[in-house]
Structures are given as C-alpha cells and as structure tokens.
UniProtKB/Swiss-Prot annotation:
Disruption phenotype: No visible phenotype at birth. Mice have lower blood glucose and pyruvate levels after overnight fasting than normal, while the levels of ketone bodies are increased. After 48 hours of starving, their rate of glucose oxidation is increased, and glycolysis decreased, compared to wild type mice. Likewise, their rate of fatty acid oxidation is lower than normal in response to starvation. In contrast, there are no differences in blood glucose levels between fed mutant and wild type mice. Homodimer. Interacts with the pyruvate dehydrogenase complex subunit DLAT, and is part of the multimeric pyruvate dehydrogenase complex that contains multiple copies of pyruvate dehydrogenase (E1), dihydrolipoamide acetyltransferase (DLAT, E2) and lipoamide dehydrogenase (DLD, E3). GO terms for cellular component: mitochondrial inner membrane; mitochondrial matrix; mitochondrion. This is [Pyruvate dehydrogenase (acetyl-transferring)] kinase isozyme 4, mitochondrial. Kinase that plays a key role in regulation of glucose and fatty acid metabolism and homeostasis via phosphorylation of the pyruvate dehydrogenase subunits PDHA1 and PDHA2. This inhibits pyruvate dehydrogenase activity, and thereby regulates metabolite flux through the tricarboxylic acid cycle, down-regulates aerobic respiration and inhibits the formation of acetyl-coenzyme A from pyruvate. Inhibition of pyruvate dehydrogenase decreases glucose utilization and increases fat metabolism in response to prolonged fasting and starvation. PROSITE patterns: HIS_KIN (PS50109). CDD domains: HATPase_PDK-like (cd16929). GO terms for molecular function: ATP binding; protein serine/threonine/tyrosine kinase activity; pyruvate dehydrogenase (acetyl-transferring) kinase activity. The record marks Y157, R161, W395 as: Interaction with the other subunit in the homodimer. SMART domains: HATPase_c. GO terms for biological process: cellular response to fatty acid; cellular response to starvation; glucose homeostasis; insulin receptor signaling pathway; negative regulation of anoikis; reactive oxygen species metabolic process; regulation of acetyl-CoA biosynthetic process from pyruvate; regulation of bone resorption. It comes from the Eukaryota.
Length: 412
C-alpha cells in the first residue's frame, strides 16, 4: 500500500507540474516520422553522424511519447487512475521531460552528445517493465468494474497502439545507444540491433532450441523439428534478409513454444511425438515462415481470442515489486508477437483446424526499402475511435431456443 501511495503521489506531482501539460500538448501536435530499415541502416553506417541522430531523436522521441500520452488520457477514468497506469504515465512524462532538456543543447557539443546517450540508457531502463505494469493496470481496472464489449474493443485498439509505440521508441533508443555509446556491446556484424545479412534459418533453429529446452524442462519431452527452406528469389542460396534478429527470435520462440505445448498435451498417450514443421520461403517481395503442428488445433470461435490481451490459458500472475515482473499469464505472447511482425509492415496470422493442428504464419518484407515502421498517431480519427458507442448488430443473432416451426400455424 505504501508503494501504491508513493506511485500516486509521484504521478500526481508530475502531472501537476506546469511544464508537463504544455510539453505534452506541444509535441502531440506533431505526427511521428516513420523510418525504413534502409534509413536505420544509413544512420548506423560507417559514415554515421552522431549529431544527425541526436538532432532527430531529441525531437522524434518526445513526439512519439506525447502522442501515446494523449491516448492514455482519453481512456476510462477508472483505468487511468489505477496505480499501475499512473506509474506508467509518470514514467512516460518523466522521460519526455528528460529528452526535452536537450532541445537547448547544441549538436556540436560533445558533452551533450555523451549525456544524451546516458539519458537514453536511463529512459530505456525506466521503461523496462512497461509491458507487465500496463497489463497489471488492465487487471486492476477489470477487478473494479464490468468491461462491456465496446470498452474491451477500445482496450484492444489502445494496447496495440501503446505497445507498438513502445517497440518503436525502444528500437530508436537501442540503435543510438549501440552505435554511439563508448562501450561497444553489440554484435560487430550488426548495425545497432539490425543484422544486414540476417540468416533466417539460423534464427529459426535457435528459437526452436530455446523453446525445446523450456518444453523439456516442463514436460520432460518435446517434439523434433522438420525444417524446409525454399529460396524463390535466389534458388539454391541461403536465405538472408535485413532484419532485427531479436524481433524475429521473439516471434518464433512464442510460436514454437505454443506448438510444442499443444503437441505434447494432445499426443501425451502416443509412443512418439509428431515433429513440428517449419517452412521458410523467400519470394521477391515477402519472406514467409510457417510453423505447423499436429497439436489438435483450436475451435474457430477461440482463434480470434488468441490475439486478445484479455485472453490467456495460463493462470493470472501476481505482480511484485521486483524488476523481473512476470509476463506469462497476461495473454500477451501472441498479440505482442504480431506487433513485432507488423512493426516493419509484416503480419502474423493463425490458421487452425480443430481436431488436427495449427499453422502459424509470419510475413516479413524481403526488401529493406519496403520495411517501414508502422506507427500510431494521435489524430481526429484515433480520437473518434475511442468515442464509438455500442450499436445494435445488423446481422441476425440465433436464439438459444429457435422457434419450433411445426407448432406455428400457417396464416390463411
């Protein structure tokens, strides 16, 4: 309780500061500027200019933070006032304030450039637990009131945008930190977190091994992997694209984990497990990865729920005060993975056959020039989305007790 009161006081003091509303309002008037993978590579090339990156980020990061802060403010009051959402909001406001300070500093000032890197590290660390903390806020809100279908739809809309915003700001900060920090901790073959020659099959195999190790620990068994690769663009050559390996690994690990769990539980009485199939295909425009299992599939009515932030098959976790807050059980694995795919104009879809198995397909852009950030912007269209009211369905809804036509008398 003391921690909660401290959070509320901290957030309240930040919100009441005269500078904060003005700065949030100011930067929210600008639309975010999406970058392509090619532009991100150019920022980190051998001729990369730290001053140019500094000048761009000191404007762009506050714009992205302010845009999503405006959306937080139009959420239901009971949700915004939960301790967890107040904490997240205070983090975003404080980070925006930290970054705005660099507007008065010259890109030619080497000390300012060094301090900017330190500030980005501080902001990144501050936002470390944003995902589970916001998830906890949703749970706190749902504990206080009944969530109607329209509100639930708005929450899904907001969380997709909120977490996509977080992915994008984290990407920009990581790029600058990894490229311009004095301590070079990144992979020497990468440009920041981007691999210009990402070996897709190697990432698939690594993600599978990580999921397999987890499956073995929990179930004491796991299915094998059957991997097929087809390079339709350059037949016979390995499949490489420009991509962020950590993003791809995140998606694949989630899909393999789900496929293994379904396979083991569905085939627990069989002498051997059916392998999980992975198919990697590079075309002229798209890279497609299909993960197929024989885990029994799911009914059609459940398929859409799998991408809902309010649906999970795992027990609801309990938050504590540690930095390592749990994420499993919030139901965020698939929806967050889909956001990673969509971030650079890709997608992630599920196709299930109940009683047989599931195909999960990741679509990514094959060309770095077409891999452009997909960013939320707070404008009139976004505002109107939150104002939608519940309307009567324009399709007939079957009654639980259909009329018995045999008893109906024909009108003469």
């Amino acid at each position: 309780m003391k921690a909660a009161r401290f959070v509320m006081r901290s957030a309240s003091s930040l919100s009441s500061a005269s500078l904060v509303p003005r700065e949030v309002e100011l930067f929210s008037r600008y639309s975010p500027s999406p970058l392509s993978m090619k532009q991100l590579l150019d920022f980190g090339s051998e001729n990369a200019c730290e001053r140019t990156s500094f000048a761009f980020l000191r404007q762009e990061l506050p714009v992205r933070l302010a845009n999503i802060l405006k959306e937080i403010d139009i959420l239901p009051d009971r949700l915004v006032n939960t301790p967890s959402v107040q904490l997240v909001k205070s983090w975003y406001i404080q980070s925006l304030m930290d970054l705005v300070e660099f507007h008065e500093k010259s890109p030619e000032d080497q000390k300012a450039l060094s301090e900017f890197v330190d500030t980005l590290v501080k902001v990144r660390n501050r936002h470390h637990n944003v995902v589970p903390t916001m998830a906890q806020g949703i749970l706190e809100y749902k504990d206080t009131c009944t969530v109607d279908p329209v509100t639930n739809q708005n929450l899904q809309y907001f969380l997709d945008r909120f977490y996509m915003n977080r992915i994008s700001t984290r990407m920009l900060m990581n790029q600058h930190i990894l490229i311009f920090s004095d301590s070079k901790t990144g992979n020497p073959s990468h440009i920041g977190s981007i691999d210009p020659n990402c070996d897709v099959v190697a990432v698939v195999q690594d993600a599978f091994e990580c999921a397999k190790m987890l499956c073995d620990q929990y179930y004491l068994t796991s299915p094998e992997l059957n991997l097929t690769q087809v390079n339709g663009k350059f037949p016979g050559q390995p499949i490489h694209i420009v991509y962020v390996p950590s993003h791809l690994h995140h998606m694949l690990f989630e899909l393999f984990k789900n496929a293994m769990r379904a396979t083991v539980e569905h085939q627990e009485n069989r002498p051997s497990l059916t392998p999980v199939e992975a198919t990697v295909v590079l075309g002229k425009e798209d890279l497609t990865i299909k993960i197929s299992d024989r885990g029994g599939g799911v009914p059609l009515r459940i398929t859409d729920r799998l991408f809902s932030y309010t649906y999970s098959t795992a027990p609801t976790p309990v938050m504590d005060n540690s930095r390592n807050a749990p994420l499993a059980g919030f139901g965020y694995g698939l929806p967050i993975s889909r956001l990673y795919a969509k971030y650079f104009q890709g997608d992630l879809n599920l196709y299930s056959m109940s009683g047989y198995g599931t195909d999960a397909i990741i679509y990514l852009k094959a060309l770095s020039s077409e891999s452009v950030e997909k960013l939320p912007v707070f404008n009139k269209s976004a505002f109107k989305h939150y104002q939608m009211s519940s309307e009567a369905d324009d399709w007939c809804i079957p009654s639980r007790e259909p009329k018995n036509l045999a008893k109906e008398k024909l009108a003469v």
